[in-house]
Amino acid sequence: MRRSIACLALCLLCIMQPGAAREAAYGSIAPSRDGIGKTYMGREIAQVMGYPGADWLERGSREREERPELLLAALGLAPGMAVADVGAGTGYYAGRIAARIGDNGRVYAVDVQPQMLVLLEDSMRRRGVRNVQPVLGTATDTGLPPGAIDLALMVDVYHELSHPREILDSVARALKPGGRLVLVEYRAEDDRVPIKPLHKMSEAGIRREVEASGLVWQQTVTTLPWQHVVIFRRP
């Protein structure tokens, strides 16, 4: 019975106008301890980590916990690429990506917190990184140029987006045909991952939400200790 109701709901979403379908996918509940009380496709959206917690992004244990070199290897980076780091924070990954795509490549480091972009710019300046361009986005728009991006990356960001469908649409517009979106999220399927439940996502949940925006699942990489790397492409 539940499956029939779910299928009916999906069919209704498919025949609605795009704006109406987006609104229908959102809901509200009593906020949980780590959530905001807003839901998307039945999932409560997690609270955002603000810029006062930026030190956590640069914690000494992060390399051991996340193995960034394994993620970078999975991204298929090449010199000259245009890459968007959406929810870039302090630039932990933006700087590493910049080194791999070279001076002819560009990293668009997107964040909605101006204070976080100040920290990012300071970090890039200290490290002598010149091919990272800060972009101040909004809750509904990444601010990325249309059809210009080879690869968009979100590391532990998607589950906190207050308007996930609008951001997915914005990313899709920014991707070149065949361009890829990569979501990195802590695995909800694994109880041993020591992260709060709302800050983890299952592969099935990620795929359900992203595929609803029209992007096509390509593969899932499972080489990271605690996170899965779910890769989609623009048709």
What are these regions (language model features)?
Residues 22-84, 122:
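Class I SAM-dependent transferase core
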Residues 98-99, 165-180:
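A short glycine-rich, Lys/Arg-flanked "PGG" loop and its adjoining helix->strand segment in the class I
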Residues 180-207:
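Conserved class I S-adenosyl-L-methionine
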Residues 217-219, 223-235:
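Core SAM-dependent methyltransferase catalytic element
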Residues 79-80, 103-104, 175-181:
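Short glycine-dipeptide loop
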Residues 84-142:
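Class I SAM-dependent methyltransferase SAM/SAH-binding core
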Residues 83, 152-153:
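Hydrophobic beta-strand segment of the Class I
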Residues 140-152:
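A short acidic, Gly/Pro-enriched loop at the edge of an enzyme's catalytic core
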